[in-house]
């Protein structure tokens, strides 16, 4: 996949849920490593001169590296990127909303065209190295992110303190600089009214539950990001092991509640899922929030064998494909709200039809 296809097409490596572990509940795993250069001011303090110097150092490190996966990545500079394309990168989860909206000097993205590896340049930190994989694969995501980290550190001098670890713009990231997160689909926990209690317990265990695009975003379509809070005093391996163990408990609770809903609310659940499928396959206008809510019900119905089998890849693609920037990119022109809702309904009808296995 070329970098042009990254913007023109939706499917990315993390969307491949066909064979990934626990992929009916764990949509994706992400590991992010925050790094800063030792002799360059933090991003919010950069001026034009230091920003230019910083970008030159990053460019040279990328060009000099002989590590295969780093050489396969391509550099996208934001000064040459439209606001629409920045939003597309946010909708693909490759950059944060803050990164897209920032006006700081010299920002960009090093990205592997399949989206499995990405390095945000000059977001909150100089570098945020990320690996995205489908299903529950935190160890593998960390391994691949660490390889990029090691390759860059051969060429760059990272800010590191022997006592505190890696130094970051935000004190909560000091230490490993690592944020491990899972994108979870938890409809049964939400429907049963257990989310408040469960999420409070997760917070007490040192984990954070956020919305679909991370910090400061709302949970839509029963998608939640579960991530570690603590980066100091724990090793990367310990952080991953803890998050994996606790997430397994959340997964088990979700499975038990799905079974309970089926046993105790069979007809109500069938009606809810059937109505969602009917609306999505026939609607001519649909908003983003309504679509994500109904797609959550359809995904639940597929996972529980209550409606025709639809490829998990098709459902994962739809979550991104129906977002405003992707719809506008497909249309090739500006769209008002009604036009977007009409295009969204069309995209969903087509995808659900073509995504049905055996059709």
Swiss-Prot record:
Assigned GO CC terms: extracellular space
GO MF annotation, one: protein kinase activity
Function noted in UniProt: Catalyzes the specific phosphorylation of arginine residues in proteins.
Protein family according to the UniProt entry: Belongs to the ATP:guanido phosphotransferase family.
Cysteine pairs bridged by disulfides in the record: none
EC code: 2.7.14.1
Renumbered ranges of motif RDXXRA motif of the pArg binding pocket involved in allosteric regulation: 340-345
NCBIfam families with a match to the protein in the record: PRK01059.1-4
InterPro entries per UniProt: Arg_Kinase, ATP-guanido_PTrfase, ATP-guanido_PTrfase_AS, ATP-guanido_PTrfase_cat, Gln_synth/guanido_kin_cat_dom
KW Nuclease (keyword) present: no
Binding site for ATP: 28-32, 93, 128, 179-183, 210-215
Annotated source species: Syntrophomonas wolfei subsp. wolfei (strain DSM 2245B / Goettingen)
Enzyme class: transferase
Activity regulation, free text: Appears to be allosterically activated by the binding of pArg-containing polypeptides to the pArg-binding pocket localized in the C-terminal domain of McsB.
Record keywords: Allosteric enzyme, ATP-binding, Kinase, Nucleotide-binding, Transferase
CDD domains: bacterial_phosphagen_kinase (cd07930)
GO biological process, one term: phosphocreatine biosynthetic process
PROSITE patterns reported in the protein's UniProt record: PHOSPHAGEN_KINASE (PS00112), PHOSPHAGEN_KINASE_C (PS51510)
Domain Phosphagen kinase C-terminal: 25-257
Reactions catalysed: L-arginyl-[protein] + ATP = N(omega)-phospho-L-arginyl-[protein] + ADP + H(+)
Protein name: Protein-arginine kinase
